[in-house]
């Protein structure tokens, strides 16, 4: 039984509850989010909040991350992916990691200005910067605000490498900039595909582009010479784990050069949000899926241990690893993403970077 049979399921959003913010003194957990008598939900439309940060490039020292530097022009994400690890960051802003994460979006309009300042630091050496480390830089609001596009114009101006991860076809709007970046080996695009099953996609990621649409993004980018990787992430044992080969095959058929994956982990409030969701969306297999996730993370839903937190361990995790490896060997043999060119960077003084 899916959520079609469950009257408690709130359609159009991922989270079914607004969980308690651990940073707030008074606890209030909102469970019946479509109740007509709930005064706190008079407006369920997406709201924008502006932040004016003093810096925009974040640095990570996590040993299991391939990108050490990232920019998040937005916090919160209207896509509503139920599993999103970035949900917990919303609590720092005084919001809930649940429904608030999907409908209260924080925008950083001064991000381009801050990036230009970053590039012009006296001792700056070019590094690949990820768009974005937390939430999708091409989520729906980007269509109107164009903050990501402005950032890409700066990456092109200074000829600094950039890696993008998205699940939205809004990226195709910026083909003009991306094509120029690709011609100089300055861009990689990672397209996230969690499931080819449209019914499952609608439950997991209610406001995202269909898998068919994302495959079309890979194909169109590839046709323009823009290198693409598919991210089959996250893999949720018992929900989409059987789709790993088909996702990689489909992406390879559209031109993807490589693939990656992660196994879901449910840290902080996400464990409560996901548990509530799966009991409403898939009550017939909720307990089994939760136990399978735990088996990949030392008996817990959450996992912060480097090396294991994103790849898991144990029999189920190992079977997923083997499935992924076999699919890559079969469908992506002799393919690889091109290297970035760091020698083209043009700082404020106009002199190109020397790597020697």
Region locations from a protein language model:
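Flexible, acidic/Gly-rich N-terminal and inter-domain linker regions that tether
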Residues: 1-70, 339
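Conserved Radical SAM active-site core
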Residues: 39-75, 79-190, 194-202, 211-223
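Short, electropositive alpha-helical surface patch
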Residues: 145, 179-193, 240-257, 318-322
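Short, hinge-like loop/turn segments at secondary-structure boundaries
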Residues: 181-183, 207-208, 247-249, 276-280
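Surface-exposed cleft-lining segments at the edges of enzyme active sites
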Residues: 199-207, 233-235
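Conserved C-terminal portion of the radical SAM core fold
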Residues: 212-270, 288-296, 326-330
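Short glycine/threonine-rich loop-to-helix capping motif typified by GTGT followed
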Residues: 240-246, 273-276, 349-354
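C-terminal accessory regions of radical SAM enzymes
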Residues: 278-356
